[in-house]
């Protein structure tokens, strides 16, 4: 079973935690991770891009000049794609880019990135994470004490308004509940800072 050190908010080693091998010790499947990240990014797309085809642009119903005799190239409409102000060829229209990925695939991807974080020593486990009051300064101090990377994802066990409002203002730092963890965020941030209670929730959810 993989083991990690447990730190307190001052960065001191206070114990060791045995991680569930079924979640933090799987064979990393890079292709599954790629597919899930691609799915997440596709689902985020607004899909509101829109442009007009030549049939939708106002005007252009009259032939601009006669077919022959002018010396100029023949034209049928001033709204043809080659004209300034003309329509767009195969103009994009609003569409839904989202699609579903099987639950088993999503779970395998999460397990793969969590395993990778443990293997690369990028997962920092805290015994607890508490702040007496909303303070970005103290939040920065905690991250500095535990030597987290400048790009860090903080994972807590439950919604805590004090922690959310303290960490959300730090550049390149995100905070989320364990049950809302996702593959893209795990890869986007170099350090994964997680509490022991949040680890238990992950082991319950993804077991």
Curated annotation (Swiss-Prot):
Ranges of Basic residues compositional bias? Answer: 60-71
Disulfide bond positions = none
Which GO cellular component terms, listed alphabetically, does the Swiss-Prot or TrEMBL entry include? ribonucleoprotein complex; ribosome
Cell membrane is among the record's keywords: no
Instruction: Kindly indicate whether the keyword Ribonucleoprotein belongs to this entry.
Output: yes
Q: Name one GO molecular function term.
A: structural constituent of ribosome
The segment annotated Disordered runs over 44-81
Name its GO BP terms in alphabetical order.
translation
Task: Kindly state which keywords UniProt assigns to this record, in alphabetical order.
Answer: Ribonucleoprotein, Ribosomal protein, RNA-binding, rRNA-binding
Q: Which SUPFAM superfamilies match?
A: Ribosomal protein L4
Q: Which family does it belong to?
A: Belongs to the universal ribosomal protein uL4 family.
Role summary? One of the primary rRNA binding proteins, this protein initially binds near the 5'-end of the 23S rRNA. It is important during the early stages of 50S assembly. It makes multiple contacts with different domains of the 23S rRNA in the assembled 50S subunit and ribosome.
Subunit organization: Part of the 50S ribosomal subunit.
Q: What is this protein called?
A: Large ribosomal subunit protein uL4
